[in-house]
Amino acid sequence: MDAWQADPENRKVSRAGDDRTPAFRWLGYCYHDRKHLGIPADNLMTMLREGGAKVPTGNRAGKGDQSFKKLSQSGILVNEIQWDIETPKGKVPWSALHKLATEPDFAKHEEAAQALGFSLFVKRARVGQTKHTRVRPRFDSWAASGTVTVLEDMITTDVLTSILEIAGRLCGLGDWRPSSPKSPGGFGRFSVAIEQIG
């Protein structure tokens, strides 16, 4: 992106503060493992922390954390680097999106996203004192699956279910989620199904 911006020829086709110019700018906000779009383990751990902060441990002695906020970080491990996102059209291959890096027409980016089962969400957002046009991938119907290892005895299957259900309802994942610190929104909510495998 820096090299693109440094080229004086590109100033003619770019508008400051508008993620649609250059059209490929939104690709920089996609998490992927070079194979598929996904939700990184770091984001999943943040979601577990935010959900854990809302689940009481039952410790009323006044000593230590009275929620599962800290225990969610020391007592749960996300086993994969990312959990791949699946749309009704399947997993989203990074190779199909990477090809768009040379496509200057934003409408073609929107068409490609639709063909892969998601949309490009265009929203005005405050950055500092000014409003900018931001573009992010939006998944109206999605699923992700993966495994976690629970190391803490206090985190039972019921507690883990509570943490994830509360996180899905009140915290979410991605930009403009309910727990976003500066600009919360209604996106990124999810429901959960847990299967114990060990």
Give the location of each predicted region.
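RNA-interacting cores
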Residues: 1-198
